[in-house]
C-alpha cells in the first residue's frame, strides 16, 4: 500500500512535471527537495497548492514531483497541472471544479520564434524614410 500512487503529467511552456500522489500528510517534494526550498517565492508556492486547496485535500496526500525545463514560473504552473491531473485520476468527480478553475487546461502559449529580417518575433528594424 505504501508504494501505491496516482500519476499525472503537467506541462507549461517548455517545462514538464511528472507528479505522483501518495496517501500521506501533505508533504510536497520537488526534485528531491521540499517545495518551499525549490520554489522560495510565496506566489509560486500558492500556485502549486491551488488544486489541493480547491478540492480540500491539502493534508491528505504526499506529493513527489520531478520537474525539468523552463523557468521557475513555467515549472510551478506545470506542477499545478500535474497535481490536478493526478487528483482527477484518483477522484473523477473533481473534474467540474478543476475544469472551472482552469487547472486541467494545458496553457499552449509558447515563445514565438524570431524571424529573419526582423529584430525579434514581431519587432521590425527601424525604418528610415530618407
UniProtKB/Swiss-Prot annotation:
Which superkingdom does the taxonomy of this entry point to?
Bacteria
Q: Which keywords fit this entry according to its UniProt record?
A: Ribonucleoprotein, Ribosomal protein
The gene from which this protein is expressed is: rpsI
What species was this sequence derived from? Nitratidesulfovibrio vulgaris (strain DSM 19637 / Miyazaki F)
Gene Ontology, cellular component aspect = cytosolic small ribosomal subunit
Spell out the HAMAP family in the cross-references: Ribosomal_uS9_B
Chain spans, region Disordered: 109-130
Family named by the database record: Belongs to the universal ribosomal protein uS9 family.
Biological process terms from the Gene Ontology for this record are: translation
Q: Name one Pfam family in it.
A: Ribosomal_S9
The entry's protein name is Small ribosomal subunit protein uS9
Instruction: Extract the InterPro entries matched here.
Output: Ribosomal_Su5_D2-typ_SF, Ribosomal_uS9, Ribosomal_uS9_bac/plastid, Ribosomal_uS9_CS, Ribsml_uS5_D2-typ_fold_subgr
Does the keyword field hold Phosphoprotein?
Answer: no
Q: Which GO terms describe its molecular function?
A: RNA binding; structural constituent of ribosome
Amino acid at each position: 500500500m505504501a508504494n501505491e500512487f496516482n500519476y499525472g503529467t503537467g506541462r507549461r511552456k517548455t517545462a514538464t512535471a511528472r507528479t505522483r500522489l501518495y496517501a500521506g500528510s501533505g508533504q510536497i517534494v520537488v526534485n528531491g527537495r521540499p517545495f518551499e526550498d525549490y520554489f522560495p517565492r510565496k506566489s509560486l508556492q500558492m500556485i502549486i497548492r491551488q488544486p489541493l486547496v480547491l478540492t480540500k485535500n491539502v493534508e491528505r496526500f504526499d506529493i513527489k514531483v520531478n520537474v525539468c525545463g523552463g523557468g521557475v514560473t513555467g515549472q510551478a504552473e506545470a506542477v499545478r497541472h500535474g497535481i490536478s491531473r493526478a487528483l482527477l485520476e484518483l477522484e473523477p468527480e473533481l473534474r467540474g471544479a478543476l475544469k472551472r478553475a482552469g487547472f486541467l487546461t494545458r496553457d499552449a502559449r509558447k515563445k514565438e520564434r524570431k524571424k529573419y529580417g526582423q529584430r525579434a518575433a514581431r519587432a521590425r528594424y527601424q525604418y528610415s524614410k530618407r
